[in-house]
């Protein structure tokens, strides 16, 4: 009797499924953007430019090599908007939404993947959470579009409806894509509306709301103002977000935007403190800002939004955990603490790992681009921070970069969006080791 060898079936982890899902959608988006119908001139867009745009949209970044408003047709803009929406919600969440709408049962494996994709604390209630994510997203985007309608319809007529919807989704998903460029004035973002309090406030609010995280919004909608019932994570996110909004606003108001009326200075300062985390819109000339302000924006870009949100970056909780651990070390305490709760040691390790990974990608990418393009390192650091944190702000060099440098930015955007732990666990597995080696002390500092 002939015995055939048995082949062990390879089971993909949840983290590998998330990465594969993003990569597949990214490639399909690039192929659609290459079609002649996607460009206003009905030309075939080079693959590397289509892939760059698709990655930027799916990873809700906003860096572009072609002006979105003047280069892409309505079809191309629609593809970009769809990619933004998928990227903001997450490929797995969108897939789960279609499964729920079609009446299919969600398997245990699929629930596990959904849990990882949404940064939910447990698998229980994940289907209900997915439904909540879809409802809250639709609510914010539709209300935002309605508030933007008067401004855009006054300037663009009936086309203003499309502009309002596009910019509302782009803002809530922290994407930073805009349609305001023309053949005569490309890559202008929201600079022409810098003095418009309604538009800048609505866009800024959508950016903040999208960056808070869906679990935080679940607490807000469930417990209203009963703050002591919020998850510790939600409290940390709200406090850290407020800290990262107020202090940069004060700095920009006092030291950067010193000309103009008080209202103009407040609007500019507020918006430029919001948009680096991690939207990509701008109402000021970024290249004209002082070097200290640009450095502050790089820091804000790297910190990013909150876990389980539409934003990218290292995340506010990573920053908060590192600060709490540093404070505990100063006080010779064994554990970091928040709001009367002890932080698990694994969270501190993960925070340090994520911060180290983002900083490594940030510096390494800038080094490669600076070498390849012969550009100042400071400009390249700004660009790579924007890419790896999926922000979309630039000092104007993106369209002029060569294919190698564009490839570096594509990789940084993709790696930044799928997340640090997702990458680590997909590559090395998420199962803890069952054996431990002998311990020995090492001097630190």
Feature map (PLM): residue ranges:
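Membrane-proximal intracellular helices of multi-pass ion channels
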Residues: 1-445
